[in-house]
């Protein structure tokens, strides 16, 4: 009874006891006993820094540290058995007035990382052939490779422009080559991976040379001497060969660096009649490397020209040649360049066709099947609009007219580049159709029925043409046809345009012509100028007022000056900011002409002055002032921003005081107005000079043109016209003066009408009025 009661009590604890026992057993089996003293004790004189040999087979207990490892810790001494403690390095601040030591860094990150350019071409020339063959080499080779240097012996009177010419001071061939190698090592030895030496009597195919050096690897070709191999002349047989200098020599940087200490010895010890043989013997004696024409599947191809025989462009040796030698004269050089360029162009077209075939053959493996390949093959697919506002618009055109004009008119004649573009597209379409249907049919264009084009930023300019054609058969039959064709003018490689350096620190002069009817707007303009320039302490901004008096107002200026409040506000502004000076000019005119007023202001300022022509409604901000400084470039560009004009308060949603809110329902960017402009005085003077020299009707044009049209028609500068979100103007009822020219009056009237409201808002307003009248 007692035994059964005891078993019933111990039965639940049985699995726990078995588990604990099994755990202890497994732990003892997995870890052997470690013979470790209680403490390290003092080291004996004969002890080594390694652990005792008797413990080599002993396993380290978990979370334990071997005594040998503790002794290996730097700075461990008598307390090596204790826990490790971090060593704190004290910070000693620099003494007051003592300049902190700056770290010396390289000028360019490529120098610090050891990044080098790929290829340098050194053209060995002379002062006699530099103006002829040297110029021809530069025109055919200079703009296609990274760096081309012309090495000549004697100094001439004047080097040809656009060429990097180095005078070595040695005319003898071997001495010239010796100094050329020294110059390359000293000036460019650490900047390039490959060096190509070639005389000016050799034509070099730039694309093939670039492909050759791009295929070679410095890891496997560290000591490479590549060219046309040739046996040494006379003497005992030599195991190596040298490279013929007439067909060019390619040297690796490592080989040149290894040759550096032996150049002087080679110059004194090696006797040779040819400079290329002298170089081959020097390289062979110093490095043991001989000339080779093949390296890891790369073959150095060359073409030896025969005098009086034309180049056979169909010859396989011609198509694969990297150099051609000898060249007789510059005309021969240009003829070779034309032939090689034609072969390179055909090779490029062939590669494009092969890539297109490969894309077509592999497109069916994609998830979408053949739909994955866009047309044309290899060009990005058309952009898919995310909303209806991003749909690209097709513009309709015919052979004579375009139905989408820059000035907003429904139809305008095709002129200039647009007309040439349409003619080129029609010619290309007809040529491609004849190529496809030849010789069964010969097609002739009758007329363009419909034409559509649009610009896709992802692809280029797309065209859809409906052509009325006449098909001619070889038997003399005729038949009218109408076909629709699609063409694409793809975008080429995107390039960064070089632009002169500009800075936000340029001094800016704001010009404000102010009529008597606009004098109430002057205080707001002056306060905006003070907020944008005077309060921040912008010393590079100035303001000049041009006060326009009518004849009657000018007669009463002594008794009742209409601009007296404006002058008082200017005086108060100068008292508030002691360093500020706001000059004004008074002009009496009945019909102010923009160009005549600008002529007067231009004469009062230096030629290097940067002008900001503003209107009384312009609200200046620091961002806009800096943008004006950055976008106006002397001798390069003039900036005409488009301000944001608020709609009529009765049409647009109501807004509070201050600048209007930038939105589609509150206003629009005024494309018709050009009241703000940023340009340099020198550019304006140059444009005015062209106007005076090119037109016999200067007086009439001075009355009919404004500054924007002056730069557009009589200046070679790039006119930048862009929206400016920092220029926000509230609505103001404007009246267009009847004294303006027809074009200026039309632009003013169009600006006033478009500034009332959007088409939707005006339509809703008319609808509400009609509903009110009907009831």
From Swiss-Prot:
Residues 54-66 have a biased composition (Polar residues). It catalyses: 3-O-(beta-D-GlcA-(1->3)-beta-D-GalNAc-(1->4)-beta-D-GlcA-(1->3)-beta-D-Gal-(1->3)-beta-D-Gal-(1->4)-beta-D-Xyl)-L-seryl-[protein] + UDP-N-acetyl-alpha-D-galactosamine = 3-O-(beta-D-GalNAc-(1->4)-beta-D-GlcA-(1->3)-beta-D-GalNAc-(1->4)-beta-D-GlcA-(1->3)-beta-D-Gal-(1->3)-beta-D-Gal-(1->4)-beta-D-Xyl)-L-seryl-[protein] + UDP + H(+); 3-O-{beta-D-GlcA-(1->3)-[beta-D-GalNAc-(1->4)-beta-D-GlcA-(1->3)](n)-beta-D-GalNAc-(1->4)-beta-D-GlcA-(1->3)-beta-D-Gal-(1->3)-beta-D-Gal-(1->4)-beta-D-Xyl}-L-seryl-[protein] + UDP-N-acetyl-alpha-D-galactosamine = 3-O-{[beta-D-GalNAc-(1->4)-beta-D-GlcA-(1->3)](n+1)-beta-D-GalNAc-(1->4)-beta-D-GlcA-(1->3)-beta-D-Gal-(1->3)-beta-D-Gal-(1->4)-beta-D-Xyl}-L-seryl-[protein] + UDP + H(+); 3-O-(beta-D-GalNAc-(1->4)-beta-D-GlcA-(1->3)-beta-D-Gal-(1->3)-beta-D-Gal-(1->4)-beta-D-Xyl)-L-seryl-[protein] + UDP-alpha-D-glucuronate = 3-O-(beta-D-GlcA-(1->3)-beta-D-GalNAc-(1->4)-beta-D-GlcA-(1->3)-beta-D-Gal-(1->3)-beta-D-Gal-(1->4)-beta-D-Xyl)-L-seryl-[protein] + UDP + H(+); 3-O-{[beta-D-GalNAc-(1->4)-beta-D-GlcA-(1->3)](n)-beta-D-GalNAc-(1->4)-beta-D-GlcA-(1->3)-beta-D-Gal-(1->3)-beta-D-Gal-(1->4)-beta-D-Xyl}-L-seryl-[protein] + UDP-alpha-D-glucuronate = 3-O-{beta-D-GlcA-(1->3)-[beta-D-GalNAc-(1->4)-beta-D-GlcA-(1->3)](n)-beta-D-GalNAc-(1->4)-beta-D-GlcA-(1->3)-beta-D-Gal-(1->3)-beta-D-Gal-(1->4)-beta-D-Xyl}-L-seryl-[protein] + UDP + H(+). One of its GO terms (molecular function) is glucuronosyl-N-acetylgalactosaminyl-proteoglycan 4-beta-N-acetylgalactosaminyltransferase activity. Ubiquitous. Highly expressed in pancreas, ovary, brain, heart, skeletal muscle, colon, kidney, liver, stomach, spleen and placenta. Its EC number is 2.4.1.175, 2.4.1.226. Keywords: Cytoplasm, Glycoprotein, Golgi apparatus, Membrane, Metal-binding, Mitochondrion, Signal-anchor, Transferase, Transmembrane, Transmembrane helix. This is Chondroitin sulfate synthase 2. It comes from Homo sapiens.
């Amino acid at each position: 009874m007692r035994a059964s009661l005891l078993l019933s009590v111990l039965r639940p604890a049985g699995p726990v006891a078995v588990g604990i026992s099994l755990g202890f057993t497994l732990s003892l089996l997995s870890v052997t006993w470690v013979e470790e003293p209680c403490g390290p004790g003092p080291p004996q004189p004969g002890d080594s820094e390694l652990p005792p040999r008797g413990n080599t087979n002993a396993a380290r207990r978990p979370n334990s540290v071997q005594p040998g490892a503790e002794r290996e810790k730097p700075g461990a001494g008598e307390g090596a058995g204790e826990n490790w403690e971090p060593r704190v390095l004290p910070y000693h601040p620099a003494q007051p007035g003592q300049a902190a030591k700056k770290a010396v860094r390289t000028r360019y990150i490529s120098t610090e990382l050891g990044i080098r350019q790929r290829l340098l071409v050194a053209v060995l020339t002379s002062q006699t052939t530099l103006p002829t063959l040297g110029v021809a080499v530069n025109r055919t080779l200079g703009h296609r490779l990274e760096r081309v240097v012309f090495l000549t012996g004697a100094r001439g009177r004047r080097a040809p422009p656009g060429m990097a010419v180095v005078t070595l001071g040695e005319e003898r061939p071997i001495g010239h080559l010796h100094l050329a190698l020294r110059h390359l090592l000293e000036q460019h030895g650490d900047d390039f991976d490959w060096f190509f030496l070639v005389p000016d009597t050799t034509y070099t195919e730039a694309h093939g040379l670039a492909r050759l050096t791009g295929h070679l690897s410095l890891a496997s070709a560290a000591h490479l001497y590549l060219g046309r191999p040739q046996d040494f002349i006379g003497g005992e047989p030599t195991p190596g060969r040298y490279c013929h200098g007439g067909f060019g020599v390619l040297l690796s940087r490592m080989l040149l660096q290894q040759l550096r200490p032996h150049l002087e010895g080679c110059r004194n010890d090696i006797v040779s009649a040819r400079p290329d043989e002298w170089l081959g013997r020097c390289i062979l004696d110093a490095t043991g490397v001989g000339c080779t024409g093949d390296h890891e599947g790369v073959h150095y191809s060359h073409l030896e020209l025969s005098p009086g025989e034309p180049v056979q462009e169909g010859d396989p040796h011609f198509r694969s040649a990297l150099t051609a030698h000898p060249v007789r004269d510059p005309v021969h050089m240009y003829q070779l360049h034309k032939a090689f360029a034609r072969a390179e162009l055909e090779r490029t077209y062939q590669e494009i066709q092969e890539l297109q075939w490969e894309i077509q053959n592999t497109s069916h493996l994609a998830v979408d099947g053949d739909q994955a390949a866009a047309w044309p093959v290899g060009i990005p697919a058309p952009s898919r609009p995310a909303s209806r506002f991003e749909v690209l618009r097709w513009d309709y055109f015919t052979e004579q007219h375009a139905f989408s004009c820059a000035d907003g008119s429904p139809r305008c004649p095709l002129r200039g580049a647009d007309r040439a573009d349409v003619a080129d597209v029609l010619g290309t379409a007809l040529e491609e159709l004849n190529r496809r249907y030849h010789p069964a049919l010969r097609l002739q264009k009758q007329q363009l029925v419909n034409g559509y084009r649009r610009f896709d930023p992802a692809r280029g300019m797309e065209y859809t043409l409906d052509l009325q054609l006449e098909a001619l058969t070889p038997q003399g039959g005729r038949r009218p046809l109408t076909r629709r064709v699609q063409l694409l003018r793809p975008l080429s490689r995107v390039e960064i345009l070089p632009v002169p350096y500009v800075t936000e620190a340029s001094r800016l002069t704001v010009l404000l012509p102010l009529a008597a009817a606009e004098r109430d707007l002057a205080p707001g303009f002056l306060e905006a100028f003070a907020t944008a320039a005077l309060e921040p302490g912008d010393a590079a901004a100035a303001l000049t007022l041009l006060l326009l008096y009518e004849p009657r107002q000018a007669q009463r200026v002594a008794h009742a000056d209409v601009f007296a409040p404006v002058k008082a506000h200017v005086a108060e502004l100068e008292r508030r900011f002691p360093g500020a000076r706001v000059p004004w000019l008074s002009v009496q005119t009945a019909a102010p002409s923009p160009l005549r007023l600008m002529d007067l202001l231009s004469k009062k300022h230096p030629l290097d002055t940067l002008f900001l022509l503003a209107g009384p409604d312009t609200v200046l901000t620091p961002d806009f002032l800096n943008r004006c400084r950055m976008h106006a470039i002397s001798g390069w560009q003039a900036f005409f921003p488009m301000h944001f004009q608020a709609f009529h308060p009765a049409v647009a949603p109501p807004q509070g005081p201050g600048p209007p809110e930038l939105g589609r329902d509150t206003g629009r960017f005024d494309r018709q107005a050009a009241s703000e402009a940023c340009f340099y005085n020198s550019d304006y003077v140059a444009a005015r000079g062209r106007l005076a020299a090119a037109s016999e009707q200067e007086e009439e044009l001075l009355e009919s043109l404004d500054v924007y049209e002056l730069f557009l028609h009589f200046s070679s500068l790039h006119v930048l016209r862009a929206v400016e979100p920092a220029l926000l103007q509230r609505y103001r009822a404007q009246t267009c003066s009847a004294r303006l020219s027809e074009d200026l009056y039309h632009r003013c009237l169009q600006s006033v009408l478009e500034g009332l409201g959007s088409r939707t808002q005006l339509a809703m307003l008319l609808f509400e009025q009609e509903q009110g009248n009907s009831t």
